[in-house]
A protein has these predicted regions:
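Hydrophobic pocket-lining residues within nucleotide cofactor-binding pockets
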Residues: 1, 45, 116, 142, ...
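N-terminal, active-site-proximal structural segment of metallo-dependent hydrolase catalytic domains
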Residues: 1-57, 61-75
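Acidic/His-rich catalytic or pseudo-catalytic neighborhoods
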Residues: 5, 15-22, 93-134, 138, ...
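Active-site beta-strand/loop signature of hydrolases that rely on acidic residues for catalysis
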Residues: 28-51, 113, 123-149, 180
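Histidine-centered active-site loop/cap adjacent to the catalytic His
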Residues: 29, 119, 176
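Structured beta-strand-rich core segments of catalytic domains in phosphoester-bond hydrolases
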Residues: 41-107, 111-116
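Metal-dependent phosphoester-hydrolase catalytic domains
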Residues: 128-135, 142-190
């Protein structure tokens, strides 16, 4: 499956117009603004111009990092972040994942954006071996059978248990994408 950017033009297969594109950007920015998060991971963006337009449309003052990956589907990863709160120091694009490391407050935090569930296991295993001091957050597709084994907790589990999700399978909602956070990180909710 490969997505061709030319499909998203007025002459392309999907007949995208400037107004349709502007509506997509506005709606995406509105969702991001409603969450008011210092870090926002995006997967499946068409190109850097889309990321630039989303960041500009947000009320928050987001900086961004965009990477085109060597994947067959042509989709890219991006990270929107508040530059006064998060300072990226390293990024490593791979096949269907992007790893971004940086300073968040006094912590060194590693963000693994995964578009492939199997890849998440390898990325987590390697990062824990190579960079054990980094507080890890895994975002996206993940099939880690026991996140606790890697010092991670599933921040999406409670919502899924409450019947919320992103895909419906077997008559129930499930989270297709996960947020696995290092147990050493704390939030206002613990």
């Amino acid at each position: 499956l490969f997505y061709d950017d030319a499909d998203y033009t007025p002459e392309g297969r999907l007949h995208w117009t400037a107004e349709r594109y502007a509506r997509k950007i506005r709606n995406t920015a509105a969702v991001i603004d409603s969450m008011a998060l210092p870090l926002v991971a995006l997967w499946g963006v068409e190109n850097e111009q889309v990321v630039r337009d989303i960041a500009a449309a947000c009320r928050g003052d987001y900086s961004y990092l965009h990477r085109t990956l060597n994947s067959l589907d042509g989709m890219d990863f991006a990270l929107l972040y508040y530059g006064d709160l998060f300072y990226p120091t390293r990024d490593e694009p791979g096949r269907r994942y992007l790893y971004v490391e940086g300073e968040l407050g006094r912590d060194t935090v590693g963000l693994a954006l995964c578009g492939d569930a199997r890849m998440a296991q390898w990325v987590v295993r390697d990062l824990r071996a190579e960079r054990p001091h980094v507080k890890l957050i895994v975002l996206g597709r993940s099939d880690l059978p026991d996140p606790g084994r890697w010092g991670l907790r599933d921040a999406t589990r409670r919502a899924e248990q409450a019947g919320r999700g992103t895909v419906r399978r077997g008559g129930r909602w499930q989270m297709r994408d996960r947020i696995l956070a290092d147990t050493a990180l704390t939030t206002s909710e613990g």
